[in-house]
Each structure stands twice: as structure tokens, then as C-alpha cells.
Amino acid sequence: MIFKEYATQVINLVNKSTEDIRERNHGLQGTLYLASVEGHAPRLYAQWITAFHKKNPHVQYSLWNGNSDDVVHRVMNGLCDLAIIIEPHNAEGVESLPVYQEPWVAMIPASNPLSQNPSPTIRACELLPYELFIPSRTSRLEEISKWFGPDAKPIVRGRIAHLLSAYELTRLGVGITIYPASAGDIANLTDVCIKEIVEPANTASYILIWNKYRQLSHVAEEFLNFIKER
């Protein structure tokens, strides 16, 4: 057992020395495996990668997206280095860094009477008579249901992981979508109306996560440090 541990240490040192020499000669290399939810997370990655790429042009990127539960699963099983999710999370062994906040909004079909009100906000109770689409994360249904009070039950017609699907269903008048405010980034505002949900006001809080029990690759450590310094 002692010999095996010693041999592992020697191999790790050799690999690190080889990596250091390659980095001195050619710059930082390797592949960053990233995952995220939708909403504002893809924009964060785009901003970070753009700036990081200017300093490290040889790094490659593999990006994957899904709902928060799926993303956490990938982190905990070593399928990605770093990931962005929306709180809350209850995964043990996850380190996190807050990176962004935005309000929740209702994306309403232009044909819906609610879209005729010029107010930029809407109370949660006003959505009760209508069929809703919400993010697909398991815990999100319970969270959103609480917005309507203990005696009310929203009509949740669908659970959606991808923003484009939510937008298309809303645009065609199937229902109203509840999503973080960045949903408005892709919306054609002649087809849908975006209103911030108030009473209660709620915030979508994005966090960057990684598995504290797994050693990050060198390129992932450099990327994480780069984000922390911004």
C-alpha cells in the first residue's frame, strides 16, 4: 500500500512537470468541461470565456446545459469541472461562488389580456387563472407554488429545461412562462410581453459550483481563479 501511494505521487509529479514544461513552451492548454442552467448563465460563460481566451488562446471548451438537478449530478459525478446553477441546492460536497442575481418574470403571450396592462410588473395572484410553464427542476414547483399562498394552486401545464421551448410555447399562446428575467433577451416583444413578478418579489440567484472532493484540473483551477479575480 505504501509503495502504491509513493508510485502515485511520483506519477503525479511527472505529469505536473510535463504539464509545466508544455505550458512554458506553448501557454496554458487543456479542455474546460463546463455545465450550466439556462437564463443568464450562458451569457456569464460567454463573457468569462471571451476574456480568458485572450490570455489563454489554446484552451478548449466543452459546454453542456440542463436544469439545476442535472447540472449538479454532472458536477458530483466528475462529468464537468465547473457549473452554474440557480439556488437553492442541497448537494453535499459542493463548493459555491455567487455570480449573478436577477428577478423572476412572467412571459405572457401578446394575445393574453394580461399583456394589455402597461405596468412592467405583475402580482403572482394575477397568474392563477392561467396555464403556466415553469423550469423543470424538481424543487422549483414547490418554490413557485408558495408564491401563490397556502390556499391557492397554480395550473402548471408543463416543466421546461430550455428557454427556447418556453418562448415558443408562450409565443403560440399555449400558456404563460415563469422564468428568470434573462428570458427577455431572446424574446420578440411583439409576440410576448415580459413582466417582473412582484407580491411576492423573488430573485433568481446564480452560483458557480464545483466538487470539493475532486481535484480540479490545472486549466479549471486557472479559470476559477480568473473568475474570482474579476
Regions found by a protein language model. Give the residues of each.
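Alpha-helical "hinge/linker" immediately C-terminal to small N-terminal DNA-binding modules
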Residues: 1-23, 29
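Central regulatory/effector-binding core of bacterial HTH transcription factors
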Residues: 29-92, 160
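Short, well-ordered beta-strand segments
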Residues: 31-35, 83, 107, 133, ...
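A late-sequence structural motif
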Residues: 44, 174, 193-230
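Hydrophobic hinge/microswitch elements
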Residues: 67-72, 76-80, 85-86, 137-195
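Flexible hinge/capping segments at coil-to-helix
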Residues: 94-132
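Short beta-strand->loop
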Residues: 95-105, 110, 177, 181, ...
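Secondary-structure junction motif
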Residues: 120-124, 129-152, 216-224
